[in-house]
């Protein structure tokens, strides 16, 4: 068995004296593990850090085996990530979220989103918005996507400012007003056509409150887990670094 693919390193742990088990995320083969001989040695370890991108070749006698990974780094992100607390915690959060995916299950569209996100992780005005949208995409990819297309009560497609915490469907301002305290806020940047607006910090935090509710209810909670520590750390960095007046997002 053999495959070749590009991808992102999301985890590394020692195996034996100098070997390493590498966890990667690729477009065609999803989240995948493989043994890298000498991967924990002095020469390779620095190249195999989470966030770095590479071309991978995986080989095994049988498909269900761990297999061997050959790694050809294509883009090293370690220095850039460690220079920014926001970027470092963002990468840790991305890795934690990707571990919700079944092993070897391809998610090419999600991989494309991650590639864009990595390019902006150290940008305080952009990274939180993109990461919140990534969490929204994770819910969709795992079968728990929200329906933000129309009001659950009236069918209206305008003034959608709430989401039902039970159904995951959008609710309009008028229909949701009597239940304001029981509904989750829906920030404009989660809706199509609103990417050019400048979200406030409060809107960004509302976005993470929304995705966090459903991530906990549908994904982390059933596994007996809590939301990742990296998520709390990323939100703390966001609160410190997010500009009061954000530049144009895309």
UniProtKB/Swiss-Prot annotation:
Coiled-coil segments: none
Gene Ontology biological-process entries: DNA recombination; double-strand break repair
GO cellular component, one term: bacterial nucleoid
InterPro entries referenced in this protein's UniProt entry, alphabetically: ARFGAP/RecO, DNA_rep/recomb_RecO_N, NA-bd_OB-fold, RecO, RecO_C
Gene3D superfamilies reported for this sequence: Nucleic acid-binding proteins, Recombination protein O, C-terminal domain
Organism, scientific name: Beijerinckia indica subsp. indica (strain ATCC 9039 / DSM 1715 / NCIMB 8712)
Superkingdom of the source species: Bacteria
Name of the featured protein: DNA repair protein RecO
Keyword terms of this UniProt record: DNA damage, DNA recombination, DNA repair
Lineage, opening ranks: Bacteria, Pseudomonadati, Pseudomonadota, Alphaproteobacteria, Hyphomicrobiales
Function in brief: Involved in DNA repair and RecF pathway recombination.
Spans traversing the lipid bilayer: none
Family listed: Belongs to the RecO family.
